[in-house]
Regions:
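Regulatory loop-to-helix N-cap segments in sensory/regulatory domains
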Residues: 2, 6, 10-18, 37, ...
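Signal-transmission linkers at sensory-effector interfaces
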Residues: 2-64, 68, 75-76, 98, ...
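Short, hydrophobic-rich beta-strand element in sensory/regulatory alpha-beta domains
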Residues: 71-74, 80-88, 92-97, 135-137, ...
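GAF sensory/regulatory domain recognition
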Residues: 83-129, 152-153, 191
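Signal-transducing coupling segments at domain and membrane junctions
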Residues: 131-136, 143, 148-174, 196-208
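A short, aliphatic-rich beta-strand micro-motif
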Residues: 173-182, 187-189
Length: 233
């Protein structure tokens, strides 16, 4: 880290010629501290992912596994809510498997209350693929979707989300949608996380861009564990 500070000081000294040395040194130390904190945070995240992966691979009960996938992803991102969809390829749909929301006290699917909500179609009759629904779009493209505020999002239909909010008094805002890819790189499900919260203030914030790749890694571990359990059964 000393070399990083020295390098920043050298660069800053050239870029800020004429500025007192103590100011340059102070700025360099501040930048180095931010780099240090980011690196430590990344290491902690990687350690968490390893622990989560081991936990998922050792789970023997399908209901507990599904619940744990959502719970671990929510804990990792500090998300208020999470939904897990399982893809039914033969019928071209996404079935609700797990729905969790701390603020609303909702814990459905798995070993909890049965989910009676209609499935999400991946195709819309003769109109082709369903890219209006964000989870269907994620399943079809295999790409993550990170939205700061669903009420301002373009390209997707969030009327159902607005209706849900109106009926419950909730306010859906930030959303991260991640595909679950198995060992053959096939999308077997979709993980949707809702309303990331600042760990210090509790305010709803966007999902950090640097966490997307790590959540995708978590989702891949979840998909492999789920596929393994299906094969064993």
């Amino acid at each position: 880290m000393h070399k990083i500070v020295q390098g920043i000081e050298d660069y800053a000294g050239q870029a800020m010629a004429g500025v007192p040395a103590e100011i340059v040194a102070g700025l360099a130390e501040r930048v180095a501290q931010e780099i240090r904190e980011f690196s430590e945070g990344q290491s902690d995240h990687i350690y968490q992912l390893v622990k989560i992966g081991l936990g998922l691979s050792s789970e023997k009960n399908i209901d507990r596994l599904l619940e744990r996938i959502v719970r671990e992803a929510r804990n990792f991102t500090n998300a208020d809510g999470g939904t897990l969809y399982i893809r039914e390829s033969e019928r071209d749909i996404l079935d609700f498997a797990i729905v969790q929301n701390d603020s609303l006290g909702v814990f459905m699917g798995g070993s909890g209350e049965v989910i009676s909500w209609p499935s999400v179609p991946l195709r819309l009759g003769d109109n082709g693929e369903n890219h209006r629904n964000v989870s269907a779009h994620c399943a079809l493209t295999g790409e993550p979707v990170n939205i700061s505020d669903v009420y301002d999002a373009e390209g997707f239909d969030f009327q159902g989300t607005r209706d849900f909010d109106a009926s419950t008094g909730y306010r859906s805002r930030s959303m991260l949608v991640i595909p679950l890819r198995d060992h053959e790189d096939e999308v077997i499900g979709v993980l949707q996380l809702l309303n990331a919260k600042d760990r210090e203030t509790g305010a709803v914030v966007p999902f950090p861009v640097h966490e997307v790749g790590m959540v995708m890694s978590l989702a891949s571990q979840a998909a492999i564990a789920l596929t393994k359990m299906r094969l064993v059964r």
